[in-house]
């Protein structure tokens, strides 16, 4: 029970002894119930882990700072309502836009997957092969313009990262003029509920397609690769959390997960598009695989056709129930079943 609990019990015992008999008994009874409830709540996380079945282990954690650009593998990350965070790097908090403010992704510019954004202290570094690195401050100057952007039809703001950054990206892609914007904490997030009503009105994202968390299992990836001539990587599908040690497509049935103190709730499957055909190592889009193979065996149930259309499903979208930090190697437990 601990020193605090013992002290409280002693005070209530003295109080009970100074009261009439029936009041003393009642006071002692209420005290025992209250302290018992406190002890039970404190012991519940440990007891719950003993009762739960482990369904896997965290094998990889990925943050994609710039939408459609190279992912950053991390050994641990904070789980926030808007996705993974590691220091100053947050998932999909930077976005490439065109002159009209529309998002630009690897669907239009496949070579975006070759650009990386890393952070060292207060300095961000944009890097790409055969191109000089560009350094920029983690805090975008407040004198920079704020743009109204559009991501999958929903408006969201972003602060311009400057002319040098715009020229660097445009030069590397050899494209029309593009700009890089940054989502800041005071800006209004997008609501995935406006995209798919399976999400809750309170769920929020910055520049992610639909959800703050995407989970995929190594077993599902291995099953897909067994059907392909040219193997693909997890980064073709841009998951945030990759799970090992589970059955093939087990993630399809995980309603709620517990990882450390973090609780995640499954919302829906991730429907796949042509972006999966971009090779993350070369920036070349094949337009066929692995999408064609996925279409042959990962279609939705006919009753869900209105939600997913004819797009194949691979990986699952989750939202946050309880925040905390997760690490590679953490056991993954199933909740609510």
Curated annotation (Swiss-Prot):
Residues 187-335 form the MOSC domain. Its EC number is 1.7.-.-. Residues 2-20 are mitochondrial matrix. One of its GO terms (cellular component) is nitric-oxide synthase complex. The keyword Glycosyltransferase does not apply. A lipid is attached at residue 2 (N-myristoyl glycine). It comes from the Eukaryota. It is a single-pass type II membrane protein; Lipid-anchor. Changing residue 165 to A: No effect on binding of the molybdenum cofactor; no significant effect on catalytic efficiency toward benzamidoxime; no significant effect on affinity for benzamidoxime. Pfam families: MOSC, MOSC_N. It is found in: Mitochondrion outer membrane; Membrane. Its cofactor is Mo-molybdopterin. InterPro entries: MoCF_Sase_C (IPR005302), MOCOS_middle (IPR005303), Pyrv_Knase-like_insert_dom_sf (IPR011037). The chain crosses the membrane at residues 21-40. GO terms for biological process: cellular detoxification of nitrogen compound; detoxification of nitrogen compound; nitrate metabolic process; nitric oxide biosynthetic process. Mo-molybdopterin binds at residues 67-68, 92, 210-211, 238, 240, 271-273, 317. It catalyses: N(omega)-hydroxy-L-arginine + 2 Fe(II)-[cytochrome b5] + 2 H(+) = L-arginine + 2 Fe(III)-[cytochrome b5] + H2O. Residues 93-183 are annotated as: MOSC N-terminal region. GO terms for molecular function: molybdenum ion binding; molybdopterin cofactor binding; nitrate reductase activity; nitrite reductase activity; oxidoreductase activity, acting on other nitrogenous compounds as donors; pyridoxal phosphate binding. Component of a complex composed of cytochrome b5, NADH-cytochrome b5 reductase and MTARC1. Comprises two structural domains, the molybdenum cofactor/Moco sulfurase C-terminal (MOSC) domain and the MOSC N-terminal region, forming a cleft that accommodates Moco. The MOSC domain, which contains a large seven-stranded mostly antiparallel beta-barrel, engages multiple interactions with Moco both pterin ring and phosphate group, allowing for a tight coordination of Moco within the core of the enzyme. This is Mitochondrial amidoxime-reducing component 1.
């Amino acid at each position: 029970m601990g020193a605090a609990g013992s002290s409280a019990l002693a005070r209530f015992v003295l109080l009970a002894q100074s009261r009439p008999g029936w009041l003393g008994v009642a006071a002692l009874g209420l005290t025992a119930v209250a302290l018992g409830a406190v002890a039970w709540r404190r012991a519940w996380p440990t007891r719950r882990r003993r009762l739960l079945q482990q369904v896997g282990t965290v094998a990889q954690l990925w943050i994609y700072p710039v939408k459609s650009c190279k992912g950053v593998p991390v050994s641990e990350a904070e789980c926030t309502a808007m996705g993974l965070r590691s220091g100053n790097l947050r998932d999909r908090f930077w976005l490439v836009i065109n002159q009209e403010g529309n998002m630009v992704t690897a669907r239009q510019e496949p070579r975006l997957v070759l650009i990386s954004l890393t952070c060292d202290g207060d300095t961000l570094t944009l890097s790409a092969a055969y191109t000089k690195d560009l350094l920029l401050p983690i805090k975008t100057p407040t004198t920079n313009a704020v743009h109204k952007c559009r991501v999958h039809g929903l408006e969201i703001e972003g602060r311009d990262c400057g002319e040098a950054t715009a020229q660097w990206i445009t030069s590397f892609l050899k494209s029309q003029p593009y700009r890089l914007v940054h989502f800041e904490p005071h800006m209004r997030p997008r609501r995935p509920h406006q995209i798919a009503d399976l999400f809750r009105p309170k769920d929020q994202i910055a520049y992610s397609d639909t959800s703050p968390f995407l989970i995929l299992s190594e077993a599902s990836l291995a099953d897909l690769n067994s059907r392909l001539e040219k193997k693909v990587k997890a980064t073709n599908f841009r998951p945030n959390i990759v799970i090992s040690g589970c059955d093939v497509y087990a993630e399809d049935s995980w309603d709620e997960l517990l990882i450390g103190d973090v609780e995640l709730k499954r919302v829906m499957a991730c429907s796949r598009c042509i972006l999966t055909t971009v090779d993350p190592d070369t920036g070349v889009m094949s337009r066929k695989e692995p999408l064609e193979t996925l279409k042959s065996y990962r279609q939705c149930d006919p009753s869900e056709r209105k939600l997913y259309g004819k797009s194949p499903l691979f990986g699952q979208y989750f939202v946050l129930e309880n925040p905390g930090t997760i690490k590679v190697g953490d056991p993954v437990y199933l909740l609510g079943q």
